[in-house]
A protein has these predicted regions:
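Short hydrophobic transmembrane-like helices used for membrane targeting/insertion
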Residues: 1-3, 18
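Short, intrinsically disordered, charge-balanced linker/junction segments flanking boundaries
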Residues: 15, 180-182
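N-terminal metal-binding scaffold of metallo-dependent hydrolase/deaminase domains
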Residues: 16-57, 67
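A cross-domain feature marking catalytic cores of carbohydrate-active enzymes
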Residues: 77, 171-173
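Alpha-helical scaffold segments that flank or form the walls of functional sites
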Residues: 86-168
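Active-site beta-loop-alpha junctions enriched in small/polar residues
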Residues: 138, 174-179
């Protein structure tokens, strides 16, 4: 599967000065049982404005070999958990022991480090064909527990990270008030 289209379409979306760009896909999956051949996709100001099946490429179309398909959506992400990779799988741990390193990482994040970590996470998603993410957002305070002057400081870092990676994000604001089941 050619995920290049997701990047090219995202590129066209970011280039708001570009009024119209047309792509011609050798094959496109349109939700049916099989892919459709020779699909022309028109993009205007970052939005798909037309899709034509079974047509030949026209002069100026950007040709895409292989199969294109709509971008995937990751509807459940905790971007900062990327920092846990390789740190929680040793021994016979369980969910409760896993929380300790998770809290340690969460308590060390600043808007800058959170943004960098999220940008790397979102870039990996984009490289996998994900074009939208639902990010569970529950880190709102400074390392010492005090509020930021701007209460959305950490959220703004997440928004900037998703824009930097070129994927859309729904910031799912979560109130994490209790860390136990009882």
């Amino acid at each position: 599967i050619n995920v290049e289209c997701a990047f090219r379409c995202a590129k066209a979306e970011r280039l708001q000065t570009m009024t119209t760009q047309n792509f011609h896909a050798q094959w496109a999956w349109r939700g049916a049982e099989s892919a459709v051949a020779n699909v022309r996709i028109g993009v205007s100001n970052g939005l798909i404005t037309s899709v034509e099946d079974g047509v030949e490429a026209q002069a100026g179309d950007e040709r895409i070999a292989g199969v294109v398909m709509p971008g995937f959506v990751n509807a459940h992400s905790h971007a900062f958990h990327r920092a846990l990779r390789g740190r929680t799988h040793g021994g016979a741990g369980d969910f409760w022991s896993w929380r300790t390193p998770m809290y340690e990482i969460a308590n060390r994040l600043t808007p800058e480090t959170y943004g960098e970590l999220a940008a790397m996470t979102f870039a990996e998603m984009a490289l996998s064909g994900i074009t939208g993410v639902g990010e569970f957002h529950y880190i709102h305070h400074q390392q010492d527990g005090t509020r930021y002057v701007n209460p959305n400081e950490m959220g703004l870092a997440m928004v900037a990270a998703s824009q930097r990676a070129g994927i859309r994000m729904a910031l799912l604001d979560v109130a994490y008030l209790h860390a136990a089941l009882d």
